[in-house]
């Protein structure tokens, strides 16, 4: 009886989790129309590109593709506009667009009706990027740069000389094996007057709906970090409703999507303003305005920042900023998901296969829960031995549920049986299941990670639904191994009969890695059940 109810409990918890998850998905922001943006941002509809003190700006100026500056490293394929020095294209050469494609995954781009670029410049009283005068037009030595073999870094300088003779050098520094780019300014004030400038960096993106589903909800939108807010999502609806303006020491601003992130990270010791805006036509902006620098005549000023564009690699993100790794959002069970992710990475480093690593995770979890599982099945066996007495009670008390309940509690107390003893392993397993769900959903390492045979990507559903069907069959076998108690409500019996079918249908669209975890867990549970029952029979408990 307890086994049947435990399976029913799993089902109810599982369905409740899915309903909660779908509610979160339904609450996700929808792409705003141009009309809505115009109405909600009438006072700032010119806030397109250059964030002055009042966050006003000018339209994007992009040269023809042949004039873009190409930079290639072992990780990045970047294109930079000489007008303003904006990064207008970024592809990840080690990550494919599709599992069966040779094309790299593109994060930043501008084509057709979609814009996703990273802008930066100098604003303020003597800034060279302003709404009044436009963007600085830089000169470069060549249109193509590549990280040479044997070299660990590549610096690409952009030079601009203003009318007053002041020279501005905007440098992009790339490092082998990394996705972060140093974006730095060197300003030599050769004029007779002091200069005052302020750096800004922002990410500009056309509002685009996340490719989300009930079984794989994902987030696309902004996020930021500040002294009083370690990590907060700021979605497109938030940007449309209110311009963000948060003064902080350090901080960062980012645009997130499934598995990947782009982020501006100003110096941690500077006072910065994290801002957002929404321009007419549904163009979202999030970024930072840095410290104001006063440069005396004859002086040279260095201004530094970092821009990250790549996968949500927690180790690399943490090295850039101690809170940037929080963009890998494991939900409310993050404290449990983090060690699961670490253990998954640990196993994979030895076996070299993510599917095998998931199997090892399953064995670890089931092994850790074995003492509780043994207590569960022992309690269930004792409950079965009490079935004749429970049946006699049902006949004696009939429909008097109150007296029946009191008599059952007295019997449990006398026989030292805990009717809820079988629930604890289930209650402990569900948080682990949900945490692993988020690990598989959020960890970029599992994107396009193969297992064996037809399972070429553990982060998406089984293309032939073999694993979900096997999982349903394993649930059916577990159910058949437990007799239906005569005291069990007929409605519960019917629900139990349909539970394997319901689970199978749900799991059809779950990531194959998660289904693999549940399938192996069921097989281990069946094996443990046989071993435990064999031991109980030797002790006279059947």
UniProtKB/Swiss-Prot annotation:
GO terms for biological process: protein insertion into membrane; protein transport. GO terms for molecular function: membrane insertase activity. It comes from Shewanella frigidimarina (strain NCIMB 400). NCBIfam families: PRK01318.1-1, PRK01318.1-3, yidC_nterm, yidC_oxa1_cterm. This is Membrane protein insertase YidC. Pfam families: 60KD_IMP (PF02096), YidC_periplas (PF14849). CDD domains: 5TM_YidC_Alb3, EcYidC-like_peri. It is found in: Cell inner membrane. Belongs to the OXA1/ALB3/YidC family. Type 1 subfamily. Required for the insertion and/or proper folding and/or complex formation of integral membrane proteins into the membrane. Involved in integration of membrane proteins that insert both dependently and independently of the Sec translocase complex, as well as at least some lipoproteins. Aids folding of multispanning membrane proteins. Interacts with the Sec translocase complex via SecD. Specifically interacts with transmembrane segments of nascent integral membrane proteins during membrane integration. The gene is yidC. It is a multi-pass membrane protein. The lineage of its organism: Bacteria, Pseudomonadati, Pseudomonadota, Gammaproteobacteria, Alteromonadales. The keyword Ribosomal protein does not apply. Its main location: membrane. GO terms for cellular component: plasma membrane. The chain crosses the membrane at residues 6-26, 326-346, 350-370, 421-441, 458-478, 501-521. Keywords: Cell inner membrane, Cell membrane, Chaperone, Membrane, Protein transport, Transmembrane, Transmembrane helix, Transport. It comes from the Bacteria.
């Amino acid at each position: 009886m307890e086994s049947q109810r435990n399976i029913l409990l799993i089902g109810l918890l599982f369905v409740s989790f899915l309903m909660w998850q779908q509610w979160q998905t339904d609450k996700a922001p929808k792409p705003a129309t141009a009309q809505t943006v115009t109405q909600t941002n009438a006072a700032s509809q010119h806030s397109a590109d250059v964030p002055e003190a009042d966050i006003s700006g000018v339209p994007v100026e992009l040269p023809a593709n042949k004039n873009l500056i190409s930079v290639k490293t072992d990780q990045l394929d970047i294109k930079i506009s000489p007008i303003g020095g904006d990064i207008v294209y970024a592809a990840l050469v080690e990550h494919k667009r599709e599992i069966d494609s040779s094309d790299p995954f593109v994060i930043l781009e501008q084509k057709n009706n979609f814009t996703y670029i990273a802008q930066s410049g100098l604003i303020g009283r003597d800034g060279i990027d302003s709404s009044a005068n436009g963007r600085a037009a830089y000169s470069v030595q060549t249109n193509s740069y590549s990280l040479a073999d044997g070299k660990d870094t590549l610096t690409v300088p952009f030079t601009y000389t203003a009318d007053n003779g002041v020279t501005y050098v905007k440098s992009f520094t790339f490092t082998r094996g990394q996705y972060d780019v140093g974006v730095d300014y060197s300003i030599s004030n050769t004029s007779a007057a002091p200069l005052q400038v302020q750096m800004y960096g922002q990410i500009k993106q056309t509002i685009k709906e996340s490719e989300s589903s009930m079984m794989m909800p994902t987030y696309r939108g902004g996020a930021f970090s500040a002294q009083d807010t370690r990590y907060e999502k700021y979605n497109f609806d938030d940007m449309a409703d209110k311009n963000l303006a948060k003064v902080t020491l350090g901080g960062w601003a980012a645009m997130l999507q499934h598995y990947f992130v782009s982020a501006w990270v100003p110096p941690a010791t500077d006072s910065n303003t994290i801002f957002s805006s929404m321009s007419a036509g549904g163009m979202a902006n999030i970024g930072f305005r840095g410290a104001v620098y006063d440069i005396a005549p004859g002086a040279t000023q260095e201004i530094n920042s970092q821009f990250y564009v790549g996968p949500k690699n927690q180790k690399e993100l943490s090295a850039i900023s101690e809170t940037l790794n929080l963009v890998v959002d494991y939900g409310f069970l993050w404290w449990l998901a983090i060690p699961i992710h670490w253990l998954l990475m640990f196993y994979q480093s030895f076996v070299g296969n993510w599917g095998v690593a998931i199997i090892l995770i399953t064995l670890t979890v089931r092994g850790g829960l074995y003492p509780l599982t043994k207590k569960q099945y022992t309690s269930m066996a004792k409950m079965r031995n009490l079935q004749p007495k429970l049946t006699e009670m049902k006949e004696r008390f009939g429909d008097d549920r109150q007296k029946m309940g009191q008599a059952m509690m007295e019997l449990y107390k006398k026989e030292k049986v805990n009717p809820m003893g079988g629930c604890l392993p289930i209650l402990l397993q569900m948080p682990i299941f949900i945490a692993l769900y988020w690990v598989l959903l959020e960890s970029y390492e599992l994107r396009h990670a193969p297992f064996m045979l037809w399972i070429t990507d553990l982060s998406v559903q089984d293309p032939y639904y073999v694993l979900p069907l096997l999982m349903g069959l394993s649930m059916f076998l577990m159910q058949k191994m437990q007799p239906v108690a005569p005291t069990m409500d007929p409605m519960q019996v019917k629900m139990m009969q349909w539970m394997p079918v319901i689970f199978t249908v749900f799991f059809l669209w779950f990531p194959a890695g998660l289904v693999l975890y549940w399938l192996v867990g069921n097989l281990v549970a069946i094996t443990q059940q046989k071993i435990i029952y064999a031991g109980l029979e030797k002790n006279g408990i059947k």
